[in-house]
Amino acid sequence: CWEQKEKVNKEAKLISSSSLCLTNLPNLWFGFESQNWVMNQKIVLEVVPWVDYKASRGWTKQNKKELETEITRLDFVSSLSKKEIFSGEFIDLIIGKYKYKEFKDLLPSEKANSIQNLAIQAVQNTKQMNDFLEFKRKTAWDFYKKNQHQKAIDYILKEIVDNKWAQAKDYSALGDIYIETKQFVKAKESYFKATQLDNNQLWYQLKYANALVFNEDISEAKEIHKKYKSNNIDVKTSWIQQAKFDIDFYKSKGLNVDDFKKILRILD
């Protein structure tokens, strides 16, 4: 099935599995012809198996396009600043873990789980976790704007907190929703976690103090206000301005703000 008519000394030849004579072949024979009838002669044949690793995994250019389709189904991809880099990394992770047939044979639940895990890994590898988390936060915020408070809470807990990605701003957002829904104990706990993660952001300290008032821990709240009332929350907003704004906001949401009168005496 294959013949080398030219005389050879040391030469490597590649016989591909695509050769018809190698299909379902139990044995492979090599024959040599020599016209040397006088001198002693030794023929050394070395057979080295060679496998095209990438080709053997079955991922053709067309097959990879199926992965591009999977990428379009990932809801967060549009929020990434480096989409192309993410896509390339995601495809590399998939084809590195699975042969094409293995990937196709996965159960739908197995495939969905693997895609989710490898997509997150691709986000991390391409250093785009901030974009990814901002998408999650925006999704929760959209629930909140539609007054779907429980959905917003559940989304933050499941998508961010449970995955150990939560930052101070995430616990602060939880605290805000807990306050509006009169879950004051949970609000206090969430704001406290925010202050632990970022104790330099006075906004979290103020929110924690507000939660203390709703929990009737007035004395502790007063101490926080006394400590920070001469500070600014940011470049333009003072602690006192923000504190009064918060009280008005709570009142607009129908919350009882009577206990805040005790706080206002400290601020005025």
Regions found by a protein language model. Give the residues of each.
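Short coil turns that delineate tetratricopeptide repeat
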Residues: K164-W165, N199, I233
